[in-house]
Amino acid sequence: MQKRLTLLGSTGSIGDSTLDVVARHPERFAVHALTAHRNGEKLVAQCLRFAPDVAVVGDAETAARVEAQLRAAGSRTQVAYGKQALVDVSKSDGCDTVVAAIVGAAGLAPSLAAARAGKRILLANKEALVMSGAIFMDAVRDHGAILLPVDSEHNAIFQCMPRDAAEHGGIAKIIVTASGGPFRTREPATLASVTPDEACKHPNWVMGRKISVDSATMMNKGLEVIEAHWLFGLPSERIDVLIHPQSVIHSLVSYRDGSVLAQLGNPDMRTPIAHALAFPERVDAGVAQLDLAQIATLTFEKPDYARFPCLALAIDALEAGGVASAALNAANEIAVDAFLSRRIRFTAIAQTVGAVLDGLSNRTPGGLDDVIEADAAARRAATAFIGKLPAPGVERAA
């Protein structure tokens, strides 16, 4: 039976890769809804190619522009806008599968709506679990949703794990691999001077600018540790991080009998996307077969927490529980935006997140409202902290 998709965040890198796979298998996949924030031009092009029932954008002005272009081209795709429209297409009877690829906290509400509607969810938005892990997983369980990880690391772990629960599968630990990003070997004393463009030049993966910066700080890997905790039910002490610069081994599962299973492949997001889209079957993703003889060497090293303080901060937040992970994510989003806007130095990202966590009044969230409140409070605290920092290139007066 043909799967009908709602693709949240269709104009981003995950959206591009998803639609590439979808286009290869029109007999298997059809598109119910595509969503974007403000990239109307790209969304129009996608709508004309994939003919979704609905297109959703962030605001009325973009919606009017998109609708005018679609009507001029003869498209019947309906156009909606705003947060509620995202929720509506995520729980719509017109789709059975939701690809959650909106970057950041904005993806939480529609992803949660999909879970509560019992959808098959392909989760690329890690913030849904980072911010509200227990709430989200409860919704998945209580409403019979199917959750399939799209992040390459978590998809790899999923492929290497038995289908039963971790505690009954003889699992000792899971090992999340990381490339180390563009600054793995850079002298730490020079990190304060790196530019946004340098931070966004990932050595292996093609990604958006926000997640590229998260990779450079290794906050992305910290968020993935938190996500792995909720997806696979393992405590932080049974989740290791391993630097693997070639990005060929996407993650590993270590068993109590000494066996280690790993998932390998070329660094191309179409592979985990195709796996999740077609699961439990396999389909062509358009990705070249891995040639280990050509690669020849795979190397590994332990992460340097002094070089990557954001990784340590994320693990600390996971162990603290409560709303600490939500605060971590919110502060990081504010700090990364400030860095990309050249308002703070690269090294101030970790400083900002650390300051927000130090000032956090942690508590166990009673529901989604508590998570949203913690998110907002952390954003205010991060903004206030950044406001007191000197601009890049400006030293404080003695």
From Swiss-Prot:
Residues binding 1-deoxy-D-xylulose 5-phosphate, per UniProt: 126, 152-153, 179, 202, 215, 220-221, 224
Keyword line: Isoprene biosynthesis, Manganese, Metal-binding, NADP, Oxidoreductase
Record has Oxidoreductase as a keyword: yes
Residues involved in NADPH binding: 11-14, 38-39, 125, 127, 208
Enzyme class: oxidoreductase
Record's keyword annotation contains Oxidoreductase: yes
SUPFAM superfamilies, sorted: 1-deoxy-D-xylulose-5-phosphate reductoisomerase, C-terminal domain (SSF69055), Glyceraldehyde-3-phosphate dehydrogenase-like, C-terminal domain (SSF55347), NAD(P)-binding Rossmann-fold domains (SSF51735)
Pfam families the record matches: DXP_redisom_C, DXP_reductoisom, DXPR_C
UniProt: Mn(2+) binding residues: 151, 153, 224
Signal peptide stretch: none
Annotated catalysed reactions: 2-C-methyl-D-erythritol 4-phosphate + NADP(+) = 1-deoxy-D-xylulose 5-phosphate + NADPH + H(+)
Pathway: Isoprenoid biosynthesis; isopentenyl diphosphate biosynthesis via DXP pathway; isopentenyl diphosphate from 1-deoxy-D-xylulose 5-phosphate: step 1/6
GO BP term (any one): isopentenyl diphosphate biosynthetic process, methylerythritol 4-phosphate pathway involved in terpenoid biosynthetic process
The protein's Enzyme Commission number: 1.1.1.267
Cofactor: Mg(2+); Mn(2+)
Gene Ontology MF terms: 1-deoxy-D-xylulose-5-phosphate reductoisomerase activity; manganese ion binding; NADPH binding
Family affiliation: Belongs to the DXR family.
Record-linked PANTHER family: 1-DEOXY-D-XYLULOSE 5-PHOSPHATE REDUCTOISOMERASE, 1-DEOXY-D-XYLULOSE 5-PHOSPHATE REDUCTOISOMERASE, CHLOROPLASTIC
Protein purpose: Catalyzes the NADPH-dependent rearrangement and reduction of 1-deoxy-D-xylulose-5-phosphate (DXP) to 2-C-methyl-D-erythritol 4-phosphate (MEP).
Name under which the protein is recorded: 1-deoxy-D-xylulose 5-phosphate reductoisomerase
The organism's taxonomic lineage, starting at the top: Bacteria, Pseudomonadati, Pseudomonadota, Betaproteobacteria, Burkholderiales
